[in-house]
Amino acid sequence: MSSNTVAQFATELKMPANVLLEQLRAAGVDLKSVDDAVTDSDKAKLLESLRRAHGATEGKKITLTRRQTSEIRQADATGRSRTIQVEVRKKRVFVKRDPAELAAEQAAARAEEAAAEAVPAEAAPAPAEPVRAEPAVETAAKPVEPPVAEAPAEPVAAPAAEPQPEQPAQAEAQPEPTPAAQAEPEPQPEPQPEAAPAQAVAEPVEPAKNVSVTETEAEQARPEPVVHAQTELTSQTPTPVAQPSAPAESPKSVKAEPAAAPKTTAKPGEIRRAAAPAAPDRAREEARRAAEAEAAALREMLSRPRKVLRAPEPEPQAGALSGTLHKPAGKPATTAAPKKDAKPGAPGAKKTIKTAEVSSTWSDDSARKKPADNKPAVATRDGWRAGGKGGRGGRNSRNQHQDRRHEQVQQEFIAREIHVPETISVADLAHKMSVKAAEVIKQLMKLGQMVTINQVLDQETAMIVVQEFGHTAIAAKLDDPEAFLDETAAVTEAEAEPRAPVVTVMGHVDHGKTSLLDYIRRAKVASGEAGGITQHIGAYHVETGRGVVTFLDTPGHEAFTAMRARGAKATDIVILVVAADDGVMPQTREAIHHAKAGGVPLVVAVNKIDKPEANPERVKQELVAEEVVPEEYGGDVPFVPVSAKTGAGIDDLLENVLLQAEILELKAPIEAPAKGLVIEARLDKGRGPVATILVQSGTLKRGDVVLAGASFGRVRAMLDENGKQIQTAGPSIPVEIQGLTEVPAAGDELMVLSDERKAREIALFRQGKFRDVKLARQQAANLESMFDNLGEGTQTLALIVKTDVQGSQEALVSSLTKLSTDEVRVQVVHAAVGGISESDVNLAIASNAVVIGFNVRAEQSAKKLAETNGIDLRYYNIIYDAVDEVKAAMSGMLAPEKREEVIGLVEVREVYTISRIGTVAGCMVLDGVVRRDSQVRLLRNNVVQWTGHLDSLRRFKDDVKEVKSGFDCGLTLRGNNDLQLGDQLEVFEIKEIARTL
């Protein structure tokens, strides 16, 4: 028995403990304080007390429910047989009689019995007497019930033999009243709590008992009615009385007990004498009215339709009908006995059979059901199953079978929710709606679409079709296998342990980031980079006196914005390197924005303090303007002056970095599947796809199945930043892994999966998704550019870019695409990691593109193919050079700019008109020079009158090419004779000037 204290119980109930203690004391539980223990019996007493206090009574109804599940097989729309689950639910409610009402009825019954004893002995054996003594019969049923429950197979009339030895002489003289009178004193007038189930059973039994009484009254005019009734009732007794679901059979068995006792001793003449009516007319009328009312109520209850889903039953065989229901062959005795003894025309017999059979018990129901057959249930027009071989109309069974074969199966329409994916075929859509594909095609034809069964429909069309069929259409996405990753991440939880900080060095180009990192690593990396600038993101881990620190070195050039953003995303602390002689530059500002967007703390390293022109104070002022406030100004950003050449301030810088790391309390699980970030990726000629990974949590082991973006694979080899083979890598350790199927994109998340098949599935899904998005973007770009280029002569410079690593490819493509203008557009046809191959050259031939190799070279076969077809191959190892040359090539493709240049001024001094030539002007060159092919502008009073070309230029009678200032000449204008004295001619030329970007 569970127990707890009053205080704990009050906490569970969310109420004050002292109030609960008062209620327990009021309920009769002797408790002193809130620390006393409360048992389950105390809780029951409290509940009973509270119910009485609130006027609640015990439950008066008992509801019994039962479920039965069966299966039927039925053909669906496609002709395939499928199994349908059929569930039958039954409910029975039993009402408990009020004890006060029962006591009142028993008292009234005893008074009537006392009055009946005063009647002469001849009138005593009247069969109507039990009607007036209903409560006595009910109470007599209570002690009879336990022996019946112990031996349910015996007839119920057997226990009635117990009172016979006590008064055998009275049994001969008075057959019926003797057992009834003996049964009276046995039950207690106040029912005990144990008797409650018997009362509950007796209550619904009462109407059936009255019905049987009216039946006996109806048979009083017949010669031997009581004998028939006795045999009929005893034939019904094999059903156990103790079952609560047999409300109509138990009273008959109880009533049969007093009648069965005299059956062995009394003579037939005495039984006939007992059938004579002797009770007063008034009592009989009241009994008849009450019995008829209750019989009507019972008939109404039994005739009420039950809402039960049942498999269709086969038609009953001829000759197997009894009463109104078909009884199975397993229980023939219950229906055969009344037919032998009872007369066919006796109304009492009919009613008894109906009452006994309709008041179904659960055992009868289960026996009545036939086992489900494997054949599909074929429905006919009226909704009933067709008869079998032995059914009615056996002669026409062949015709019925043919009709059934041609008859369409009528199924009730069920509105479903149909999940429609982005694309679905007509056949699949029909299967989802459980209709034939021809119906869907017919519906689409009505909508104006001619389709075939395998044609793929888009989501919108499919949803319209679903709605036309009356179903509810729900737009559904394809199954996303990436949901598996969320489940995996939720399951794998391990204890977090301290890890090393990841520090990213950021800043403007040439401010000394890599040199600073070199001094920390005691290695020379900057000199190895082409042009002395960092073009790759480097990852190193350094062991200092205070622990391990992982450094990420990002490029400072503007082209590497995405790389810097990735560095800030993967990092814990950012070291912002600013040159003391240069100050804050554009990439410095960008690095500040990246750090703030990632919520990463900053440590400013003011570099190059060893230079004479260094001005650290100016750097501080400029950084304050960028909202980076040093600690000495009241901010939270440490400023450390350092020199990458002399090593001054390096220890202070590391001290500040590790101090920030301690404040952050960096932790990560170690004993867990690894997760990380792809820092850099490239295609190595001998090793295949190689990716630089920063492990962020867990432990990466050799042989693990990894998923990185749209690529997957098994880790075949792991190298540290020094090129040494390692077997495992913990959190904050950068490693280079081999074994991926293709080069992942830099910035992709890497994670270890247990199942290679699942990794392949997710990678293929991502590839398809990426391809769809890429095609959609290209299609959108093509449409936009098509309309933009319709009226303009836009030129396109096609490029194929091949680089050594993924990050450089991303940066170079981004820089080249930004060069596009309205007149010349840069189109990167293909960009990838690796050397220049024959396929790249073939693509360049098809698209008339220039191939750019960044830190890579072309294969020998690719070189020959390029020379043969005149394809331009260009190699670069510095990103500046590549961008500048592409810019120059684009400038050469630009249309030249036309400028007008005035070269001379001429004044008209004389005007001559010559018939064959027209108007000739005698002029003086005031300024500059006049050339024959020049254009002129006619000015009159400084207003432009005409613009055109010179037709001829002569000095004296000779044609000349030009006339210089201070000389006179004669000239004619092409297409214009409107010349007057004093007009001026402005001579000019249009020159084409090459444009630059």
Swiss-Prot record:
Keyword terms: Cytoplasm, GTP-binding, Initiation factor, Nucleotide-binding, Protein biosynthesis
Record region (G2): 532-536
Disulfide bond annotation, renumbered to this chain: none
Gene Ontology CC, one term: cytosol
Annotated residues for binding of GTP: 507-514, 553-557, 607-610
Localization terms from the record: Cytoplasm
Region (G3): 553-556
Low complexity biased stretches: 116-185, 195-209, 256-280
Feature: compositional bias, Polar residues: 231-242
Domain of life of the native organism: Bacteria
tr-type G domain span: 498-665
Function summary: One of the essential components for the initiation of protein synthesis. Protects formylmethionyl-tRNA from spontaneous hydrolysis and promotes its binding to the 30S ribosomal subunits. Also involved in the hydrolysis of GTP during the formation of the 70S ribosomal complex.
Family: Belongs to the TRAFAC class translation factor GTPase superfamily. Classic translation factor GTPase family. IF-2 subfamily.
Name the record gives this protein: Translation initiation factor IF-2
